[in-house]
Amino acid sequence: MPLPWISLIWFAYLIVITVLIVVASVFIHVYQTPRDRSSFVTFMCVFSIAALLATVMLLPVDVALVSSTTSSALGQRKEWATQEEVDKITYSLTVIYYSLYFLDALLCLVGIPFAYFWHEEYDEVAFEAGDQTPCKRFWAATKYTLAFIAVVIALVLVGFFAPMSESQPGHDLGYWRGFLIENRGEHAFTFLLGFVTTIGSCLYVFYTPSGLALLPALFLRRSYSFANQTLVGSTAMQLDFNRERQRQLEGRCGGNSALLSPKDRRELDTLVREERTLIRRQRLIEGRQEEDQSWPVTVYSKLKTILRPFRLLGGFSLFLVGLSTWISLLMTVIDKLINSPCKHHCGYVLSRTNFNPISWLLIQSSRAFPTDYIIFALIVFLFFWGSVVGVVAVGIRFLWIRIFQIRKGHTSPQAMLLATAMLTLITLGLNYSVVMMLAPRYATFGPQTFCDLAPTSSEEQPDCSNHWHLVKPCSEKADSTAADNTCTPSVASTILNRVALNFPLFGALLLWAHFLFLGIYLVILVASLVRSPRLDERQLDEDAEEAEEESLLASTGRSGNPT
């Protein structure tokens, strides 16, 4: 393979990885609370997110490398692209993919849990007294992590001893027969990958469509910061009413609350607590109003007003892109449901993919690398951004109970680790969705074509230089010797198709999960565009209480360290 071309492809991937590390670092820095930062937790979060996104972003490199072996204009393999060279390319990509997938699984199932328990085991008092050493802390965290290691070992053993899939009578797999695994080790790895991908897809179909549907509304509708004036008035009114009611109750007892009835005493206690909350809220709002009057905020507000048309354009563009991806996913899932040759028996694999707008766009742009890489990266970042917005909006929940809330500058290390674990699993679901649902034809063969013409001899390739109409795009169902000798599927599609074929239950669950994805996106999109924004007063009160605590801690620190 020409060295300059392969260097360009891998250099583009290196740039993307650098951008991924920056994106992950910014995300963690923005959302993690500054009061309780942990360098190890931050490293694990950044590394995990970057590693998962690097796995997804390897697809355009995969497609570019296998597609470079053929001439899309002639439908022939290039002179240097012998079968030995093609095998070297696919083997190196397979090693990289398996290494990344294994690393992803370890990070999700072992690395992040260990970081969680490592942080939980930290005792500041014991550490300062010398009673807690790093070795003791490491051993305590490892003991709790052993349960997760046991889960990984159990999954590998289940995959190792699970029955091998075979071609069933009445379901001729044809092209897909070669995807059935006979190696026990590869069978175990495929099961582990299918399991974590299915778990990730369960999170993906809830959080990602929620965030994607909310994104356009965040750009199109105005921010509710203007509600501060209204909130100041309503808070002052509530405070006046509260104090007037307290005066009435205190007037009944002459200032001695012991003379009040139990009902009035409970009401007075409630009013006192409510008064403290309202005072904190009033101080917080006044502080924010003072910040809004500073010149940087004033300049920023004026700049936002000037750029308002571009913000609307961005929101409308996000709406169109989201709608295009929704249509592409809908077309593929219906195509799989109707045209799969063996339906749920083989995980709804397709013999030939019908037209898909996103896949078509990527195939056309792949003829001028790295144009397809840029478009693909923007789509992946959009889905990841939507996943983050979904996690922030919904929070970390067990069933309907919210365990942690993800907020800018207010997320604890424990919540940050759980959010990272969720995002890594979601990214595995995103990886399957992009390859198998969003752009299946691009992800499988890219722009590869073959010459559907009988060769003049067994050693020569078919020549379509005078028969351009016989140059056809590669597909799984291309029943032609020329296609078998010319077309090379991407390694990513091969690995994920093996998951669906060897474990059809995973393939069926992943297909039906995308119907849920489409439905949730549609419902939340309509609701977000129709429903007006509301100010969360409960969250405002929590911010006020936290600001008061920080102010007290700061004043205590100043009084304890006189200059």
Curated annotation (Swiss-Prot):
InterPro entries, A to Z: LMBD1_LysCbl_Transport, LMBR1-like_membr_prot
Q: Which GO terms describe its biological process?
A: protein localization to vacuole
Q: Which family does it belong to?
A: Belongs to the LIMR family. LMBRD1 subfamily.
Q: Where are glycans found on this sequence?
A: N228
The protein, known as: Probable lysosomal cobalamin transporter
So what does this one do?
A: Probable lysosomal cobalamin transporter. Required to export cobalamin from lysosomes allowing its conversion to cofactors.
Per the record, where are the segments of Acidic residues compositional bias?
539-551
Keyword Plastid in the entry? The reply is: no
- Give the record's GO CC terms: vacuolar membrane
Q: Which UniProt keywords apply?
A: Cobalamin, Cobalt, Glycoprotein, Lysosome, Membrane, Transmembrane, Transmembrane helix, Transport
Q: Which domain of life is it from?
A: Eukaryota
User: Which residue ranges are recorded for the region named Disordered?
Assistant: 537-563
Residues crossing the lipid bilayer are 8-28, 40-60, 95-115, 144-164, 188-208, 314-334, 374-394, 416-436, 506-526
A GO molecular function term, named singly, is: cobalamin binding
Q: What is its main location?
A: membrane
What Pfam families does this protein map onto? LMBR1
* Location(s) in or outside the cell: Lysosome membrane
Specify the protein's topology with respect to the membrane. Answer: Multi-pass membrane protein
